[in-house]
Amino acid sequence: MTQKERRIFLIEYLLRENPNYHGVQIPDDEDEQKILLRSLMNVRPPQHTSKEFLRIQDNYLQEAIRQHGITGLADLKPVTGRGNGDWYVWRGDITTLKVDAIVNAANSGMTGCWQPCHACIDNCIHTFAGVQLRTVCAGIMQEQGHEEPTGTAKITPAFNLPCKYVLHTVGPIISGQLTDRDCTLLANSYTSCLNLAAENGVKSIAFCCISTGVFRFPAQKAAEIAVATVEDWKAKNNSAMKIVFNVFSEKDEALYNKLMS
């Protein structure tokens, strides 16, 4: 099957399984088809999926990521003068990064972003991992029986992403003036991810900028906490785990490079 044939199959499957979509027309434009498919995946509840759907979805997503370009750890340049070549700052799409684990800035529901085509990292990771990720996360949350507390972490397979695992953590939401508790909770998110990564044999991990987006944690302070917390954890655990700070903007890239220079 071509990518177009896969995309049409997936859209038709998702439209058929929900009677509310009766009458929805599939657009001819490729970009509009991609938007429709992503939207349908983003709002789809965790439920049974046919083996045929999963096979075609997996082929489609893996090819889409391959076309976008996969970045491996060997493609990154270590930060000079820090550690033993095990610290990196990288600006790019975390869903294309081939490391052992990537970190997802999740919400307390832990089942991904339900807003169609939202640009948050939670949405991107769930979209390109595939519908299996929401199903697995929903199972974890059902067994847990309550929302995910701030500063903790869960680990799942990465499914169609180039990495092996996704670590999901809920960072603090800033609604007013930044407090010491906010800073402690953010540090806890980093520590929880590192502990869980080590328990699962992870040798390389990529952190997004936890809490700095819609959760409104100030970027400068968040970066300081991130670097200090990871550095402290590596020292206490005598760890050679490779650390990638994945950033979105040139400003954040400069900020992390300055902190680690």
UniProtKB/Swiss-Prot annotation:
SUPFAM superfamilies: Macro domain-like. Its EC number is 3.2.1.-. This is Protein-ADP-ribose hydrolase. Keywords: Glycosidase, Hydrolase, Metal-binding, Zinc. ADP-D-ribose binds at D93, I94, N107, C120, I121, D122, S211, T212, G213, F215. Belongs to the MacroD-type family. Zn-Macro subfamily. PROSITE patterns: MACRO. Disulfide bonds: none annotated. GO terms for molecular function: hydrolase activity, acting on glycosyl bonds. ADP-ribosylhydrolase that specifically reverses the SirTM-mediated mono-ADP-ribosylation at an asparatate residue of GcvH-L, by releasing ADP-ribose from the target protein. May play a role in the regulation of the response to host-induced oxidative stress. The keyword Transferase does not apply. PANTHER family: GANGLIOSIDE INDUCED DIFFERENTIATION ASSOCIATED PROTEIN 2-RELATED, MACRO DOMAIN-CONTAINING PROTEIN. Residues 74-261 form the Macro domain. Signal peptide: none annotated. Zn(2+) binds at C113, H118, C120. It comes from Treponema medium. It catalyses: 4-O-(ADP-D-ribosyl)-L-aspartyl-[protein] + H2O = L-aspartyl-[protein] + ADP-D-ribose + H(+). Its cofactor is Zn(2+).
